[in-house]
């Protein structure tokens, strides 16, 4: 109970002699107000009091705890709980007998079993779309019962649920058409074995299902089959002429196939004959002296065929009984009398084409579903076309004024959030988009702006299938079954083994050219390449050879013989020994002897004696001989060995003034030659003797001097000196 309600104080019981009106005083204002109140207001207040009591019960914690206990019990024990079963019975009884929700049936049915008896817990194990399929099949059974086309046996309506697994829905044996519900249908495989048992305890009629299984095996495109053997259809199936184009309904039926049915389809030969008779496109199968079977891609199409087939058979039977024979009947020609095209429902006086495309028989089937819903059958059918057209509001933003409230009444329920309303609206739009009969294709169209600039770029758009320009002519093949191109009557296990083998090869990354063609096995194709491919391959080959030539250096001795290599090695060793001997001689000559002071008054030797060796040689002569030897070695060797020496004042020690005066003019040329050669070589170290007149400190001995070429006039003077000697 609510906490706001406070129990009133108990009034004392009235005395035995006190009447009802004696309890109130006539002067009481509350009594006067209730007495003067109108009867309508009094009734409204009484209803409000009753609603208030219901609201208090729904908001009470005890009621909430009881509901939670029922939900927990359902989750633990399942749908077989006694409390849940009682609630279902009460809900079904109230829904079927309530005249305010559903109008009364024209046949005055006081109680009828609803078609959609699937609850939320039951639909959890169903496949995608199976709930709606069950409701459609059960509705077809009820329509057969209402039209009087139902028979006691072999009147079965089957539907293919899954093409991949080949599961089908069929009613159990022993259940009449008026008793079939969505939950009572049984799901079986192609062999008639039960996959999922319904709510009833009746078995499956495998003999009656054998005909349907043979049809589904021969026609993978068929999804629904309705077996009908009413008196009219059985009479036409027994005629040699078959169904004649006597009425317009016979033209709407389409092509028909005739088959001699013996009552069962257990033999393999019977299945092959049925496949040959049925063909790839026929939708009506006439069973001789038995009845007819209507096929369709959808439940709506199959019932559309059955409805017009029954009407055509009734017209033909009545016409033959009245005319007395086929020769007295006027037959219609298919070319002259064309039936209406599929989905061409148009407005009156309109020439702009179809109003809205739809599947065959969809509008008629939805009308019958609305009839069943109005009768209280609760079909559970999802309508694609609304019965009442939505009124367009051009000025909806100004027709309804804006209202703002700052408080919420306690009696009002919890307001629905705007986000939830927006989500529900989006879901409705999505459902309408998914249920559209139009077929759209994804097409790449060149952009006009980019096309004008000279670089066309494709633009992806969605277009209707009818508007897309077809590049190739021919009849398109509708592929609905993944095994559509598998040969008939093949071993399914063999197909599965081959599929598993291919998947195993893909897992192991084993790539091959695939199975070899038996027709092209003996054909030898010449390898031909285009000029562009040849040029690309040649340029690639040149680049590879160029890289290889840059990476590897050619061997200069690859063209020589062994004898030439031996001679070359000996020559290299000989030159190496000569260089070592010359180097030893240079070192011996460059080594300074004992320090001897040069006397300024020493006799001047002639140039002829300058090259001879003597035990006591002046430092000047020794330096001259050393310089001459170095000059001769510099002319033969590219990089002469330079001994370390001491450089005084940044240049060689020049001869003294006394020597220059005594030698004369001829001697001066020789000294100039020696002085020029001294700039190319390093001088010997001088430990004693007179320093240069400048007296500047000596530079670092490790510093190298720049070499100069010997002038040509000095070379001539050397030749003259040799001649004189």
From Swiss-Prot:
Topological type in the membrane: Peripheral membrane protein
KW Phosphoprotein (keyword) present: yes
Gene Ontology MF terms in the entry: actin filament binding; calmodulin binding; protein heterodimerization activity; protein homodimerization activity; protein kinase binding; spectrin binding; structural constituent of cytoskeleton
Source organism, top-level taxon: Eukaryota
SMART domains reported for this sequence: Aldolase_II
Stretches assigned to coiled coil: none
Predominant location category: cytoplasm
Residue ranges, compositional bias (Basic residues): 701-725
Biased composition (Polar residues): 596-621
Keyword Membrane carried by entry: yes
Keywords, comma-separated and alphabetical: Actin-binding, Calmodulin-binding, Cell membrane, Cytoplasm, Cytoskeleton, Membrane, Phosphoprotein
Subcellular localization, as worded in the UniProt entry: Cytoplasm, Cytoskeleton; Cell membrane
Region listing for Interaction with calmodulin, in residue ranges: 425-444, 703-720
Modified residues (Phosphoserine): 11, 25, 60, 344, 530, 532, 535, 594, 598, 602, 606, 614, 618, 620, 678, 685, 688, 692, 696, 698, 700, 702, 712
Gene3D superfamilies membership: Class II aldolase/adducin N-terminal domain
Compositionally biased region (Low complexity): 687-700
PANTHER family tied to this protein: ADDUCIN (PTHR10672), BETA-ADDUCIN (PTHR10672:SF6)
Role description: Membrane-cytoskeleton-associated protein that promotes the assembly of the spectrin-actin network. Binds to the erythrocyte membrane receptor SLC2A1/GLUT1 and may therefore provide a link between the spectrin cytoskeleton to the plasma membrane. Binds to calmodulin. Calmodulin binds preferentially to the beta subunit.
Subunit and partners: Found in a complex with ADD2, DMTN and SLC2A1. Interacts with SLC2A1. Heterodimer of an alpha and a beta subunit.
The name this protein goes by in its record: Beta-adducin
Organism, as annotated: Mus musculus
